[in-house]
Amino acid sequence: MEKIKKFNTQIASHLANNLENSLRELRRCGAHRSSKATFTEMGIQLSGFKNDLAENNKFNALVGNAWIDNEADYYLPAVMTVDVQRQEQEVTTYVLNDHGNNQRVIMYLTGGAYIQRPDKTHWQYLNRLAIATDAKIYVPIYSLVPHDTYRTAYQEIASLYSKIYTLMPASKVTIMGDSAGGGLAAGFCEYLGKKGLPQPGHLILFSPWLDLNLTNPLISKYEDKDVTLAVNGLRKIGTMWAGDTDHQDYRLSPLYGNLDQLRDVTVFVGTREIMYPDVTLFVQKLRDAGIAVNSYTGRGLFHIYPLYQIPEAKGVMKRVVATINN
């Protein structure tokens, strides 16, 4: 009983500090974050994922659970209203909203720190995305740590992408990704450029993980504000994901890759998350390389905020729809 009380006190203290810091930042920048965004951020904090990454015993449990979960058959949460088909090829892939060959296509790479499969929030967002865009959406359940490294995931995604662009012009394809999936999407597009393969018409990223080692010194200023991610835990997962490959390889850290072949990039990031500094740097590098890029910063908002059902995400959805249908 004493242990539970201690835990609850700790969580309450963190929540109070988080709310106080949030209000202070909003007053300073003059933004007006919705109350729903504030309560959503609290819910994310209560989920405990950041603690799972930050604390050694919880991190070990996270990896242990992943050994079991990531080898088990994947079951889709019962939240979808659009048509869903499951394809078993090189990689298990869910195809959403397929009703013809004239649709635009999205290949969406879900985040989860390279250790967790897509969760309910992902599928709720993807359902809304399918309705808003009327696009056909491919969602591969790509391989993750601790069983596999990025090499397996790249093979799976490359196989799926090649099948997609043989069915339609690559210009009608959009690659999207959030968090780790956003880093994977960016690295994969750099890989396409290196291999001389066709780029998608659009690349849309939500809070992408762009440097596997998270070495930017500015990140330390944002870690306390970030209710989702902890640097040390991500670095340990990154080591597993990389295998024997240098962590600055563009497939792992697209921030350091050749950006010249990318086209029409759109990036969203919040100011209360550790990915913010590297996203800012990535956008500047894209502009320096002459790549068309649109960057949107959610002031006072959290990691992958566009995926959540908050008022601030509605404007993001409109921009995503306009980009995909352009």
Label the model's feature ranges.
Residues M1-G100:
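A glycine/proline-hinged amphipathic helix-loop "lid/cap" segment
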Residues E88-Y94, N101-N326:
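Alpha/beta-hydrolase superfamily serine-hydrolase fold, recognizing
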